Amino acid sequence: MDDGSTDETVKICESFPQVTEIHSQKDLPFDETRDKNKLLEIALKRDPDFIITLDGDEVVMPNSKQRIFYELNVLYPNVSLFEMKEIYVWDEPNRYRCDGIFNNTWSKKLFRLKNQPEDLQFARTKFPGNAHCAAFPDNLIGGTQSVRSKVKILHYGYYDEELRKKKYNFLNKLDPNNTEFDGYRHIFSEESKFSGPNGMEFRLISEIEE
C-alpha cells in the first residue's frame, strides 16, 4: 500500500517480481484499521494458506524460512495464530534495545487461513485514527490460542534519532496527552514507565539465541 509516499518506495517495490499489486491512496486521514482491511482484501484475492502482517519498517530475521515452515507444518499444524518477538534495531545494524518493554514485545503477526470465516476483518480501536490496531483479524478462529514462534522480527522504525523523533511527533499529534502509552516517551527516553529500571540497555543482534 502506497499512502502518498514521496521517496522511492513505489519504484523499489515495482522492481520486485513477487510484488503482485500496489494499492495507491493519497490525502486520506490516518486510519490503521481501514488500511489493514484493504490490504487483507487484496491478500485474500491470492487465495493464500497463510498471511503475515509486517509493517513497512519490519523484516523477518534472515534465515528464518525453514523454521517458519517447520513450525507451521510439523510442530503446530493446527494452530491458527503465531506470535513473533520484536527486535528493535537501534542506531547500529547489529545493535538492539533490550530494556523494559523492548525486551518483551511479542506481536501476533502470522495467521493460518484454513477453516476461517470469509468475512475476516480487523477491528476498530479506541485510539484516534484506529491506531494500535491488532496485526490479526478480530474474528479469526483460534485467535485466543496463539503460539510463540522462535522466528523474530527486526523492527527498524526507531533505528536512529531522526526516525524516533518523527515517530514520537506523529503519535503525539495523532493521540495527544495519551496516558496509557505514557505519552510515547519510551520511543526516545529512558525515563518512561515502559523503559527499564537501569535506563537504556543494548545487546548485539548477532548474539541472539536461535
Label for each model-derived stretch:
Residues M1-D3, L54-D55, F82-K85:
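Short His-Asn-centered micro-motif
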Residues N37-F50:
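Active-site nucleotide-sugar/metal-binding loop of Leloir-type enzymes
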Residues H23-D27, N37:
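CheY-like receiver
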Residues S15-V19:
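Short, conserved SAM-binding/catalytic segment
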Residues D2-I12, K26-P29:
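A conserved acidic beta->alpha catalytic loop
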Residues K11-E14, S64-Q66:
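Short amphipathic alpha-helical segments
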Residues T33-N37, P62-E210:
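Catalytic-site signature of metal-activated, phosphate-bearing donor transferases
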Residues D47-M61:
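Short beta-strand-to-loop acidic/aromatic patch adjacent to the donor-nucleotide binding site
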